[in-house]
């Protein structure tokens, strides 16, 4: 098969924001990466295409991540556990019926995510998409 190329014309793009770390997508992985980065003192921007943080958990209503804890669970703690504890404090979580965890609905997840993003000093950019120039 012959290699083909797409040639893009030169264009000027205005710079609207500068950052050290850009995290694209705010699902559980993106949120954790952005929070960890910001807590290290790095200028961090979190970009999300929808109007709220959380990815599929909040936009589609996919089941949350805090359902796994049982009596013999070995757990590392970390941001996921911190997220669950903050949700309990904020009244955004209820005991999960099949485990020792707490479950968060998508609306509760949004509230907790917003608080963690703002408290961590992350620069949020909602309703944005990313493309390479």
Show which residues each predicted segment covers:
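Conserved N-terminal/central alpha/beta ligand/cofactor-binding core
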Residues: 2, 10, 16-18, 36, ...
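Short Cys/His-rich Zn2+-coordinating modules
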Residues: 6
């Amino acid at each position: 098969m012959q290699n083909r190329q797409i040639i893009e014309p030169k264009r000027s793009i205005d710079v609207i924001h500068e950052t050290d770390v850009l995290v694209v997508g705010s699902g559980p992985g993106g949120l954790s990466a952005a929070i960890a980065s910001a807590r290290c003192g790095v200028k961090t921007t979190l970009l999300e295409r929808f109007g709220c943080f959380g990815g599929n958990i909040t936009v589609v209503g996919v089941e949350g991540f805090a359902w796994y804890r049982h009596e013999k669970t070995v757990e590392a703690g970390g941001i996921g556990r911190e997220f669950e504890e903050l949700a309990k404090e904020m009244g955004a979580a209820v005991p999960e019926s099949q485990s020792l965890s707490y479950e968060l609905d998508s609306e509760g997840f949004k509230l907790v995510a917003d608080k963690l993003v703002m408290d961590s000093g992350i620069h949020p950019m909602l309703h944005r998409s990313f493309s390479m120039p």
